[in-house]
């Protein structure tokens, strides 16, 4: 390859210069009375080497020159590839802080390490929610604040140390009661933070899978058909004799779907599965973890109603299809907002 490049360079050196470059001369090399009369000589030695003619005076290319100028034809006739640049940018593997001179590109950049292509489609339920239901949800949760109303400072929820000990001064406040962390505060819904579905986790518990491994295989195949993602096996943490569980042994499987896949799963669940459940009251109103997440379960008979399972029903043994638990994680900050979101999508709730 290097020898070919040397031959091309020597061939270009032997080619005579064209008349186009020979006509244009510098001011210092111009000779003749006509050139001396037409071109005023500069008294400044630094400007003597400058060209006096402008590039705007160059002749306009003719039609023949335009037809002969075909760069695409020259590229097509080139048999060997041009040498590529040796420099290739690789994003950093670790993020060393905002002050480091080398920063990771944003996740939307195709060269980023965490780049995820897409989205490739718009789910029907997601489009309906954003165009129709989002404005209604924001109107239902609207809280009017008159102009000029001073903002209330949030109260301190952590307890201070009380006593005469001098070590209590400037000491961090006490931990909350009943939990290692404080629950999140409920934020008012505005056009900036309308609740949406963030992710959905589908899990199943198969306590008899230790004796009959086929139950775990069927459960994993059912979750794979329902969600379109490969489930991971879950293991029991402790020994439970009543449920025939052993520590660190497979006891079920789970999978989590995000983004458009979560909206499509929710669409099938609301419009194809839940309406066909006989004598189903709905989701208990007492469900929720206080942070905007809602959980409910389905029986084995209800799981069979999913279209992905129903179309290949003969592939799964009827008595081995398990039930499942569905945990819907939303961007809401309270159970009230999460239930309001799911009710607008079509999930019924009931209270005893």
Curated annotation (Swiss-Prot):
It is found in: Mitochondrion. One of its GO terms (cellular component) is cytosolic large ribosomal subunit. Keywords: Mitochondrion, Ribonucleoprotein, Ribosomal protein. GO terms for molecular function: RNA binding; structural constituent of ribosome. InterPro entries: Ribosomal_uL5, Ribosomal_uL5_C, Ribosomal_uL5_dom_sf. GO terms for biological process: translation. Residues 63-80 have a biased composition (Basic and acidic residues). Residues 28-109 are annotated as: Disordered. Component of the mitochondrial large ribosomal subunit (mt-LSU). Mature N.crassa 74S mitochondrial ribosomes consist of a small (37S) and a large (54S) subunit. The 37S small subunit contains a 16S ribosomal RNA (16S mt-rRNA) and 32 different proteins. The 54S large subunit contains a 23S rRNA (23S mt-rRNA) and 42 different proteins. Unlike bacterial L5, uL5m does not bind zinc. Component of the mitochondrial ribosome (mitoribosome), a dedicated translation machinery responsible for the synthesis of mitochondrial genome-encoded proteins, including at least some of the essential transmembrane subunits of the mitochondrial respiratory chain. The mitoribosomes are attached to the mitochondrial inner membrane and translation products are cotranslationally integrated into the membrane. Belongs to the universal ribosomal protein uL5 family. This is Large ribosomal subunit protein uL5m. It comes from Neurospora crassa (strain ATCC 24698 / 74-OR23-1A / CBS 708.71 / DSM 1257 / FGSC 987). The lineage of its organism: Eukaryota, Fungi, Dikarya, Ascomycota, Pezizomycotina. The gene is mrpl7.
């Amino acid at each position: 390859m290097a020898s070919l490049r040397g031959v091309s360079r020597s061939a270009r050196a032997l080619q005579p210069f064209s008349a186009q470059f020979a006509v244009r001369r510098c001011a210092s090399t111009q000779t003749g009375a006509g050139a001396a009369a037409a071109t005023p000589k500069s008294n400044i030695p630094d400007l003597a080497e400058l060209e006096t003619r402008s590039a705007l005076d160059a002749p306009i290319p003719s039609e023949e020159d335009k037809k002969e100028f075909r760069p695409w034809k020259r590229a097509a006739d080139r048999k060997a590839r041009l040498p590529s640049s040796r420099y290739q940018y690789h994003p950093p593997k670790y993020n060393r802080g905002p002050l480091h001179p080398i920063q990771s590109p944003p996740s939307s950049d195709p060269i980023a390490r965490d780049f995820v292509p897409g989205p490739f489609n718009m789910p029907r339920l997601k489009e309906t929610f954003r165009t129709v239901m989002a404005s209604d949800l924001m109107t239902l949760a609207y809280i009017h604040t008159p102009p000029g109303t001073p903002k209330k400072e949030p109260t301190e929820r952590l307890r201070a140390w009380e006593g005469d000990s001098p070590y209590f001064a400037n000491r961090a406040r006490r931990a909350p009661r009943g939990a290692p962390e404080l629950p999140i505060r409920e934020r008012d819904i505005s056009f900036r933070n309308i609740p949406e579905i963030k992710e959905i986790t589908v899990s199943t518990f198969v306590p008899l899978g230790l004796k009959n491994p086929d139950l775990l295989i069927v459960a994993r195949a059912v979750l794979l058909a329902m969600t379109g993602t490969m489930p991971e096996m879950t293991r029991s943490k402790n020994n439970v004799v009543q449920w025939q569980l052993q520590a660190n042994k497979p006891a079920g499987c789970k999978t989590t779907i995000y983004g458009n896949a979560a909206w499509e799963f929710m669409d099938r669940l609301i419009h194809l599965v839940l309406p066909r459940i006989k004598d189903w009251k709905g989701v208990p109103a007492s469900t929720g973890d206080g942070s905007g997440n809602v959980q409910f379960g389905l029986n084995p008979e209800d799981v069979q109603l999913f279209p992905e399972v129903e179309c290949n029903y003969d592939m799964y043994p009827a008595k081995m299809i398990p039930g499942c638990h569905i945990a819907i994680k939303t961007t809401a900050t309270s159970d009230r907002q999460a239930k309001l979101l799911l009710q607008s999508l079509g999930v019924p709730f009931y209270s005893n």
